[in-house]
């Protein structure tokens, strides 16, 4: 299979990242959405279709009902998921899937039936020659050049902390909360409403997401930042809306991501904070590996892209960790693509050749082969 270029596909709840093994960045990055017209007359015209995928669905979302086949990291709608994969191969990457080995990523604690369904669709619908399925966090760690550490991965639909030892995740110590990018966008809209700006439709929430991504930051000392924002306008920034109107954003810039660190205080949700999630995962591991985990905390995913998040997480974990341990948080500049890049690197290695589930393996054993080959 060495002459066939591997396709690496990282399916996130919010965004698909797809490309070819050995390359530094994905060729295609597009929303993991399927859009269908709210009513048939809304899209009369030459280009009207019964459904739209990815960027096209995003552009037309004002007149579409938007569906996310992946919710909180787990595939919920297989028909739509198949459409997303079809779009990935034929439109975005422009490849014939039966000519390329495929690496797919999965969320930690992905149900066994889901792993089998992914495997079945790849071999039976797309007729791929070979497949490998790997946990996203393992690839994040891999792209950071390590095989032991703990990954705090916050995407669009779910946040996970995954301890990994010598390249294998430690399933009983994996933690997750359904608090991630989409929740922060909704929370930001709520904060902006308090300021007198109303954003409610799905198209308007896209504007809020852009505000969140461009202007938010994590305060190292939240209370003192809050006091400063009351006493001065130093945190205020202007944002121009698509219609040309300019709005001013102030303390919302750091109050929004504070939700990750104080879910109960900020928005009344009784969830673990990301620092508690990370700490609990480490404490669930064998005492002998904890030091290695504390010294190699990797943050990845789009929701970790706000400035200051690494420093704040470090401070919070240092407050909880044994004083004798030198805690280290690693936040690479392009961590939004860490999972994809880890997959690109890993499948490029000659040692990976024996890892694949081949078509022969599948024909002989069925979809359950994924549990034996992809541990």
From Swiss-Prot:
EC numbers, comma separated: 3.6.4.-
- Give a yes or no for keyword ATP-binding in this entry: yes
Name the Gene Ontology molecular function terms of this record.
ATP binding; hydrolase activity
Could you tell me the superkingdom of the organism this chain comes from?
Eukaryota
User: What are the record's GO terms for cellular component?
Assistant: cytoplasm; cytoskeleton
**Would the keyword Hydrolase turn up in this protein's UniProt record?**
yes
Protein's job: Actins are highly conserved proteins that are involved in various types of cell motility and are ubiquitously expressed in all eukaryotic cells.
Q: What is this protein called?
A: Actin, cytoplasmic
């Amino acid at each position: 299979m060495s002459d066939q270029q591997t396709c690496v596909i990282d399916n996130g709840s919010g965004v698909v990242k797809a490309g070819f093994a050995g390359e530094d960045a994905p060729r295609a990055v597009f929303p993991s959405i399927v859009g269908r017209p709210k009513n048939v007359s809304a899209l009369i015209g030459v280009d009207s279709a019964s459904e739209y995928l990815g960027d096209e669905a995003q552009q037309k979302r004002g007149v579409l009902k938007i569906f996310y086949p992946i919710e909180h990291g787990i595939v919920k709608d297989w028909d739509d998921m198949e459409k997303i994969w079809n779009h990935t191969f034929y439109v975005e990457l422009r490849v014939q899937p039966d000519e390329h080995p495929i690496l797919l990523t999965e969320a930690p604690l992905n149900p066994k039936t889901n792993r089998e369904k992914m495997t079945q669709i790849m071999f039976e619908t797309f007729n791929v020659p070979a497949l490998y399925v790997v946990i996203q966090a393992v690839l994040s760690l891999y792209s950071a050049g390590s095989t032991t550490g703990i990954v705090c991965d916050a995407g669009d639909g779910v946040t996970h902390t995954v301890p990994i030892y010598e390249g294998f995740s430690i399933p009983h110590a994996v933690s997750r909360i359904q608090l991630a990018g989409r929740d922060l966008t909704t929370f930001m809209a709520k904060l902006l409403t308090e300021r007198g700006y109303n954003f409610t439709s799905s198209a308007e929430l896209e504007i809020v997401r852009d505000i969140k991504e461009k202007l938010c930051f994590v305060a190292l000392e939240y209370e003192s930042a809050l006091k400063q924002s009351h006493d001065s306008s130093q945190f205020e920034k202007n944002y121009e809306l698509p219609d040309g109107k300019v709005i001013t954003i102030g303390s919302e810039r750091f109050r929004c991501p504070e939700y990750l660190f104080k879910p109960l205080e900020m928005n009344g949700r009784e969830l673990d904070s990301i620092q508690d999630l990370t700490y609990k995962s480490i404490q669930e591991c064998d005492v002998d590996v904890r030091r290695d985990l504390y010294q190699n905390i990797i943050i990845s995913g789009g929701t970790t892209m706000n400035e200051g998040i690494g420093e704040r997480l470090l401070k919070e974990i240092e407050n909880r960790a044994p004083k004798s341990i030198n805690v280290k948080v690693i936040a690479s500049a392009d961590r939004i693509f860490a999972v994809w890049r880890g997959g690109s690197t890993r499948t490029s290695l000659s040692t990976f050749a024996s890892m694949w589930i081949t078509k022969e393996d599948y024909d002989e054993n069925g979809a359950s082969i994924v549990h034996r080959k992809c541990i």
